[in-house]
């Protein structure tokens, strides 16, 4: 309270026996505020969070999204300068998560507070984060503006954490002006990769940069075994085996494929990152530098 820090958790923390109005008012009552000040603050906060029509209802009469907005209102009403949100959308169904993802940036802007938002979903970080810190095994691996962290991951762990599905990796050897991926796929070394010392690297590329057709003349072709497909409607997740590596491709459209079938997939070298033997970024994907 004295530090003006508030927290919102994955579980909806509301008093079930109190109305939405009284839930929002409860922190101010504990602070000993006057009733007129409480009423003004509650109604302003309820308006910001679009809870005004629900003020006389109790939490169990609300949808999951409304309950979470009520919990957020309780955090914001006391004028906290720092609000910590610990996976606040994790317990909501898909539709409610999508609705609140649209609402939360507006709430951030209207409140004027600093928000620290913890999530395991890269998509949420990209949608909601002005700055992003990526964590791996309790250690911050990178911090910076969200688009920059996504496009220019400092190391392979950051690239893995900040990709959904996780970034795909394959061993790559650089010899003179040529890159060899795995045992059979080749591409010329361009841009930042051309200036790297010869040696062994780890190449990384995201799921959405795998295609089923050759779209560019220098696209790298990989022969893979289909492990499974997941068709979501407008997109298909293709799970692939490439030697001992396990990859996931995300391709547009419906592409049913038989498990165990052999197939070729393609990756544009412009979307390939190279990491050194310590996992540090050695050469960013050329597209990332052009963005």
Task: Describe the role of every protein-language-model region.
Residues 178-230, 256-291:
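Glycine/charge-rich catalytic "coupling/switch" loops of P-loop NTPases
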Residues 151-175, 204, 268:
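C-terminal boundary and immediately downstream tail of ABC-type ATPase nucleotide-binding domains
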Residues 173, 230-232:
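A generic structural motif
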Residues 2-6, 10-157:
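ABC ATPase nucleotide-binding domains
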Residues 248-251:
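Short alpha-helix capping/helix-loop boundary micro-motifs
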Residues 240-242:
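Active-site beta-strand termini and strand-to-loop segments that position acidic
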Residues 235-238:
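Short aromatic-glycine-enriched beta-strand elements
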């Amino acid at each position: 309270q004295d530090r003006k820090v508030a927290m919102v958790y994955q579980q909806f923390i509301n008093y079930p026996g109190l109305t939405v109005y009284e839930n929002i008012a409860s922190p101010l009552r504990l602070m000993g505020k006057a009733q007129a000040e409480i009423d003004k603050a509650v109604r302003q906060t309820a308006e910001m969070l679009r809870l005004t029509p629900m003020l006389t209802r109790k939490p169990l009469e609300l949808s999951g999204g409304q309950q979470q907005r009520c919990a957020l209102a309780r955090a914001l009403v006391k004028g906290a300068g720092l609000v910590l949100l610990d996976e606040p959308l994790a317990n909501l169904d898909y539709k409610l998560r999508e609705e609140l993802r649209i609402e939360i940036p507006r709430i951030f802007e209207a409140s004027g507070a600093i928000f620290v938002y913890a999530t395991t979903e890269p998509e949420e970080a990209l949608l909601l984060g002005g700055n992003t810190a990526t964590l791996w095994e309790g250690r911050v691996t990178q911090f910076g503006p969200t688009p920059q962290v996504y496009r220019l991951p400092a190391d392979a762990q950051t690239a893995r954490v900040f990709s959904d599905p996780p970034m795909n990796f394959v061993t790559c050897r650089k010899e003179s002006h040529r890159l060899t991926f795995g045992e059979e796929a080749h591409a010329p070394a361009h841009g930042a990769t051309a200036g790297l010392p010869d040696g062994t690297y780890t190449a990384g590329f995201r799921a959405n940069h795998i295609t089923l057709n050759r779209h560019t003349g220098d696209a790298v072709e990989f022969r893979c075994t289909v492990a499974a497909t997941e068709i979501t409607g407008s997109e298909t997740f293709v799970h692939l085996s490439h030697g001992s590596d396990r990859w996931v491709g995300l391709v547009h459209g419906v592409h049913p494929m038989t498990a165990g079938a052999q197939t070729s997939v393609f990756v544009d070298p412009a979307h390939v990152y190279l990491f050194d033997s310590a996992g540090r970024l050695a050469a960013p994907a050329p597209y990332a530098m052009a963005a």
